[in-house]
């Protein structure tokens, strides 16, 4: 009987530890450009994958917004420090429609 009670407490303890918040991968992506799918980008806007304006476009392209990790960059072009008012973005999933839509984006530090 003691063995089964100890087993239950061990499982509960392991479950509690695994439920603690972990460091986000987003912070690693922001400083590591090796995961970018192309050049650094200058995006007019960064939005969430579940944005009601972007969601129909994603659906039309056959992309499930729930599977996107990071932000969505809109109206992106190659980053040039002299002509970009924002921080450069690293997009790790896709750059679609000539930069109109970039997936998995995050600002670089």
Swiss-Prot record:
Organism (species): Penicillium expansum (Blue mold rot fungus)
Example of a GO cellular component annotation carried by this entry: extracellular region
Phenotype on disruption: Disruption of all 7 hydrophobins leads to altered germination kinetics, decreased survival under exposure to extreme cold stress and increased mycotoxins patulin and citrinin production.
InterPro entries: Hydrophobin
A single GO molecular function term of this UniProt record: structural constituent of cell wall
UniProt keyword Signal, yes or no: yes
Pfam families the UniProt entry points to: Hydrophobin
Subcellular locations according to the entry: Secreted; Secreted, Cell wall
Top-level taxon of origin: Eukaryota
Signal sequence segment: 1-19
Family: Belongs to the fungal hydrophobin family.
Protein name: Class I hydrophobin G
């Amino acid at each position: 009987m003691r063995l089964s009670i100890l087993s239950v407490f061990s499982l509960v303890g392991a479950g509690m530890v695994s439920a603690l918040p972990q460091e986000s991968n987003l912070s690693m992506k922001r400083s590591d450009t090796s995961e970018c799918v192309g050049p650094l980008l200058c995006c007019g806007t960064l939005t969430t994958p579940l944005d009601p304006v972007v969601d129909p476009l994603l659906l039309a392209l056959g992309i499930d917004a729930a599977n996107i990790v990071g932000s969505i960059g809109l109206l992106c072009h190659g980053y040039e420090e002299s002509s970009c008012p924002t921080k450069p973005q690293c997009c790790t999933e896709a750059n679609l429609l000539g930069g109109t839509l970039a997936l998995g984006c995050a600002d670089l530090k």
